[in-house]
């Protein structure tokens, strides 16, 4: 049994139909006997929509609040995918950075990963769950939400792969769910 981490971008989780397609792919891996962690981005266009909203409210939004706003997009994706996976008969749990102590620097909007506490993720995997994890975000030592900047979900997937000694990290393109990269972290 291998530990596989899959990362899907915003277009892959843009609507219910696409979320269900991702769920089918995830369940296929789980049924093959693998442990699966899925890292997802916010639905397509959601981050840009949230950025626009922040700048409609202020010419210079507070960076802490900006990060709080931006991370709401991933919440939609992780919960949606966990629901879709469970509907296909597999146990699934959605997790945010604060739930697993995904520690970053305190530089809002451009944080760097410091440490990942893998205990909760490993426990959820051991319980038979597909773990659906929010990409792009972290938490500081003072429990402040941060974002990793554009491309942060890819970074999240690779960092999780390294921290958990995953057998593979798979990053799927948004265009047609083609696998563009397989690596050993």
Language-model region placement:
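Nucleotide/pyrophosphate-binding catalytic subdomain
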Residues: 1-183
């Amino acid at each position: 049994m291998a530990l596989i981490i899959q990362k899907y971008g915003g277009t892959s989780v843009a609507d219910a139909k696409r979320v269900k397609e991702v769920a089918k792919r995830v369940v296929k891996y789980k049924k093959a006997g693998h442990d699966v962690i899925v890292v997802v981005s916010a639905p397509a266009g959601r981050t840009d929509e949230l950025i626009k909203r922040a700048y409609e409210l202020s010419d210079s939004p507070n960076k802490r609040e900006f990060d709080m706003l931006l991370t709401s997009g991933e919440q939609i994706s992780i919960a949606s995918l966990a629901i879709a996976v469970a509907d296909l008969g597999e146990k699934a749990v959605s997790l945010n950075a604060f739930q697993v102590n995904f520690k970053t620097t305190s530089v809002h909007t451009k944080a760097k990963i410091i440490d990942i506490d893998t205990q909760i993720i490993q426990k959820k995997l051991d319980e038979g769950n597909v773990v659906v994890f929010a990409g792009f975000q972290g938490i500081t030592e003072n429990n402040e939400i941060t974002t990793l900047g554009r491309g942060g979900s890819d970074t999240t997937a690779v960092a999780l792969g390294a921290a958990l000694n995953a057998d593979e990290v798979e990053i799927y393109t948004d265009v047609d769910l083609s696998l563009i990269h397989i690596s050993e972290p």
